[in-house]
Amino acid sequence: MKRPYSFLILCLVMVSTACAQDKIIFEEDFNSDTLNMEVWNYEEGDGCPNLCGWGNNEKQIYNRDYVALEDGKLVITAEKKADTYYSGKINSKDKVEFTYGVIEVKAKLATGKGLWPAIWMLGADISEVGWPASGEIDILEYIGREPGIVFTSLHTPASHGNTINTKKTKIADIEEGYHTYKAVWTPEYIEFFVDGKQLYRFTPENYNEEEYPFKKDFYFLINMAVGGNLGGAEIDESALPDKFYVDHIKVTELPEDY
C-alpha cells in the first residue's frame, strides 16, 4: 500500500480507543481552501491522442478550473462555453492507493440530461497492464437521462470491459440532497450500498485475474462526463452549468467479521 501522505497520522491526535474502532486508511473532508495535491491529481484535456473522448465518446474537455472547494465540499462543474463543453476530473493515482476496505462517499448529484457524475476506482497497475486488466470498481454512476437510477458496476478482463457485472437500482429521492454511497471491498466479494441499503454483491465463480482483478492496490477517480456512450447523445444545455458535490470520502479497514 502506498501512503506517501501519512493519513494515519490522524490517529496520533485522537484517543487510542477511537483509532482502534475506526481503523482509518484514508479520510478526505475537503475542508481547506485548495485541493490537497499530496492526495489528488488533476486530469485535463479530451483524452487525445491515446484515448480521445476518454474511451467513451465523451464531449467534455476536462480543466482544473472546473474543480473547486466550496464550504467544505468538492465541487465539479459542467458548463458549455461557445461550442465546447467543460468539466472537471481528479484522481489519487500514485498518492492514495490501497487494497480492500470499507469505502464511504457522501455526495450530491448533478442531474441534467446528458451528465454523468461518477466516483470510481482503477487498478494502480493500469499503466503496465492496461484496461480492463487493471479492473474497475464503479462505486457510483448516475446519468441524467435515466432519472432516479444509480449504477454500481465492476469491469474485469473476463467481461472484456463490458458492463455485465452491474446493478441498476431505482431510488426515489436520489436526486434530492446528499446520499452516502458505500462499497465493501474484500478478498472474496465487493458489495455496494446507498444510505445503508444493500444494492448489489459481486462474487466471482473463479478468483483469478480474469474474473477478480481486485486483489491489489486501486486509486480513486471523481469526475463528471458530458454525453458519451453512457451519458447519452442528448444534452440538456438549459441545465448547464450544473454541479456535482462530494462532501467527504472515508476508507476504513475491513472488520474482522466482514
Task: Describe each model-derived feature in a short phrase.
Residues 1-21:
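Bacterial Sec-dependent N-terminal signal peptides
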